[in-house]
């Protein structure tokens, strides 16, 4: 039986999209997938429609390694409206409570300090976490509140930017699983006035260079430019991509000789010199260091395959 024809291009890499405000992360993903005519695409950590900023879009084989970005730290710029609390903790929700803003600068500094370091956070009902197989926001839209357990997060840095009138601006560098809306809602309660997010921008994900972010508008301009020059759009679009193994850039590299990489790519653990004693590794082959997948050091010190790059015939 012949293999079913794959739709789209076998293009592999990560695009650092600057997501526009008012668009869901999935809508942004689908637009990028169509522009690149990619056979597969996935994003790593959704941004709310209200939010803008860095949304890594993994194309092709890079989708296999997107999970490593989900575990990475992130940096945000947020502006909160003080004195108003909403049901979603952001400006897209309904105002449920209004209170005067009466705290002092000293009280603000003390409240902010309670959110630095290792803390416990109860996720918002308006989140994509699941309870009994159903997303929390689906319960919330039905007016149902379900129990949520506090989860450990780390706020590595919380910078005070400004406080003018009923607006408070902060910059937050945090671990995976941190909900900025929840931090703002909890901060508003500590200050006794309530608060919600009116502006949120993701400044950075992991160690990705901010200057490599691109907008949907720029991608469309490149497609038009390619048409005018009568060249394939891929010639202008593909250089924007980060390497497919960039989501796992924090892991050490093990380079296999071609004689060993054949066995590794067939699913077999292999021995090699220079491997760490334990943990996950990025595996490359040959003198050019071509990335072939992720491995893990097994109990016998061998590099065992965990996720492999598949090369499809043209």
From Swiss-Prot:
Substrate binds at residues 43, 76, 179, 202. Its EC number is 5.4.99.25. It holds the Pfam family TruB_N. Gene3D superfamilies: Pseudouridine synthase, PUA domain. It is an enzyme of class 5 (isomerase). The keyword Isomerase applies. InterPro entries: PsdUridine_synth_cat_dom_sf, PsdUridine_synth_N, PUA-like_sf, PUA_sf, tRNA_psdUridine_synth_TruB, tRNA_sdUridine_synth_fam1_C, TruB_C. Changing residue 43 to A: 330-fold decrease in catalytic efficiency. Changing residue 43 to Q: 50-fold decrease in catalytic efficiency. One of its GO terms (molecular function) is tRNA binding. The active site is at 48 (nucleophile). Coiled coil: none annotated. This is tRNA pseudouridine synthase B. It comes from Escherichia coli (strain K12). The gene is truB.
């Amino acid at each position: 039986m012949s293999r079913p024809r794959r739709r789209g291009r076998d293009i592999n890499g990560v695009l650092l999209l600057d997501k526009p405000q008012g668009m869901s992360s999935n809508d942004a993903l689908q637009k990028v997938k169509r522009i690149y005519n990619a056979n597969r695409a996935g994003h790593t950590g959704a941004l709310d429609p209200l939010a803008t900023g860095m949304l890594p879009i993994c194309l092709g084989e890079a989708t296999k390694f997107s999970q490593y970005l989900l575990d990475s730290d992130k940096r945000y710029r947020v502006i909160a409206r003080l004195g108003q609390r909403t049901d979603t903790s952001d400006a897209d929700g309904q105002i449920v409570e209004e209170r005067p803003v009466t705290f002092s600068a000293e009280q603000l500094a003390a409240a902010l300090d309670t959110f630095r370091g290792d803390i416990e956070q109860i996720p918002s009902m308006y989140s994509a976490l699941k309870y009994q197989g159903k997303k929390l926001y689906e319960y919330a839209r039905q007016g149902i509140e379900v129990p949520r357990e506090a989860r450990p997060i780390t706020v590595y840095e919380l910078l005070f930017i400004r406080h003018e009138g009923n607006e408070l601006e902060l910059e937050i560098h945090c671990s995976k699983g941190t909900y900025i809306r929840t931090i703002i809602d909890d901060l508003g309660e500590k200050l006794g006035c309530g608060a919600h997010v009116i502006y949120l921008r993701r400044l950075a994900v992991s160690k990705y260079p901010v200057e490599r972010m691109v907008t949907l508008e720029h991608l469309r301009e490149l497609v038009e430019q390619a048409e005018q020059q009568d060249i394939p759009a891929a010639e202008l679009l593909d250089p924007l991509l980060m390497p497919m193994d960039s989501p796992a850039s924090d892991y050490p590299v093990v380079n296999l000789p071609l004689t060993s990489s054949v066995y590794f790519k067939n699913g077999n653990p292999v021995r090699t010199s220079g491997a760490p004693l334990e943990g996950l590794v990025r595996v490359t082959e040959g003198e050019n260091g071509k990335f072939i997948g992720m491995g893990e050091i097994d109990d016998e010190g061998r590099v065992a395959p965990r996720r492999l790059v598949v090369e499809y015939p043209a």
